[in-house]
Amino acid sequence: MAQEPLNINAYQLTFEESFDSLDVSAWGERSSRWIAHTPWNGDFGDARFTDPAPGFPFTTDQGILKIEARKEADGTWRSGLLSSVNPKGEGFSQQFGYFEARMKLPPGKGVWPAFWLIGLDRSKYTAEIDVLEYYGRAPYEFSMGFHIWRQSQGGQNTTGGHWQKVQDGILNSEYHTYGVDIQADKTSFYFDRQFIWSFDTPKEFHMPFYPLVNLALGSGWPIDETPNPSILLVDYIHVYQRKPTDAAN
């Protein structure tokens, strides 16, 4: 049975980031919309996520956010990450709903951009939804998936995912939307608002989630051929809540 495209008219906008400007601080030391690190201070990949400074790693131009990865003179790569929640748990998060980013991905081997969500309560496990993960060595596909990280609490991790083939190069040459609709029973992924894949929503995902976007490098793949600089372009990040059924018609 073919799934319907996403009907955005059945949703109301709850979080709108159009990147006409960028309200970011390193750690939420002031009340900013975004912080420039994971709230738990966990780096990953082969580039260090750096504090925001004038012109790097974040710039905005005509409603487009540029996240730049750059190789410094000492050989260190630096790049950018944004999270809507700070280490105190303050900021935007939402239980259930549709989370979407419109982006143009950087070309080149070694780039590893992502748009992803983390569950707000990490006390018993970490709930993660990867709306988009892209590996520059394979410009003809991207992945989506989920994780429930329990090992740090002595449990077993749960993971699942899907690889989506696309026309070679279109993710680098055009903007596309990457979205996930989390509902109590089903979590569904969309590419350009066309249904791609779904899984049964686990009880661990019955909590607020918050969005993150970043340009990482590596993920086990060499970065000696990675273009310097590499730039992820983000048009917007929007979050929606499903309207009551009678209001959606």
Which residues does each PLM region occupy?
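GH16 jelly-roll
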Residues: 1-249
